Amino acid sequence: MRWVGEVFDVLGVTGQDHEASFPDGAAFRLEIPSVEGPRVLEAVLRAAEAEGITVNRVSQGSGAMLLRASELRDMAQAGLDAGVEVCLFVGPRERFATGAHARSADGRAHGDQVRGLRQLAYALEDVLRATEEGIRSFLVADLGLLRAVRLAQARGALPTDLVWKVSASMSPTNPVTVKILEELGAGTVNIPADVTLDELAEMRAAVSLPLDLYVESPDPLGGIVRVQELADLVRTGAPLYAKFGLRNAQAIYPSGHHLEAVACANATEKVHRAAVALEWLERLSPGLVQSKPGAAGLGLPVR
């Protein structure tokens, strides 16, 4: 098998374990997903204050395209005031469109990809529209879109200070793939919720970018609950975004006012789960440091 090791060396995925951190020296940050609009963001911030914890990033899944400009501004302002990154999914995707492929048994894996040049153009416009209202962080789930937005930045069509977060729906399952995503310009990458510590260590050794990991994942992503493992996950994967989904929760994509109460209730419980996980971390590894609000490297909104 020596020849396999030589191939891995050329690919650059056999690096030694190393201690790494965020730009502020912290080992981990907390992320609350499915924060679908201003009211849900308010619920997260209230819950974080009540629980006495810091949320560093919120992310959204329905797409920036389903929010009014005023709602984008409200989310940007709330995130800026709280020192929280607001990461919005790029809206257009195959499972929202007219084709049947993404709704078939074999095509579901392609559901968050962007189909055709017209939808890719809409996706780019969705990013530009959100940046005009102050958003500086986006979820992408399509390789072509990631390449296109990076080119748009290089040409001056999009701001240079944007964070590109690879979605869990495009999670890489080996170090070579996560390294390719880093080379394409991803800023952070969501990896599968069920990775073992050994697999997490392999990915960490291959790349320097932050890894995003569901400590608790929603049922469509496996329904994993690992709150007691947070310390091990951080020690192995730092710099790590510890992401708190919610098992046994109603699916809400695409969300809206009709599901706002559910989204707020889910978000509040996610913050509670994060607080529980932090107690486990403090019990087992009290020296692990979390980023403060507004820390360097966050894709904070702008006015």
Regions inferred by a protein language model and the residue ranges of each:
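Conserved catalytic-core segments centered on acid/base and nucleophilic motifs
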Residues: F138, A186-P192
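Active-site pocket-lining/capping segments in soluble small-molecule metabolic enzymes
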Residues: M1-I135, V140-P172, L197-R303
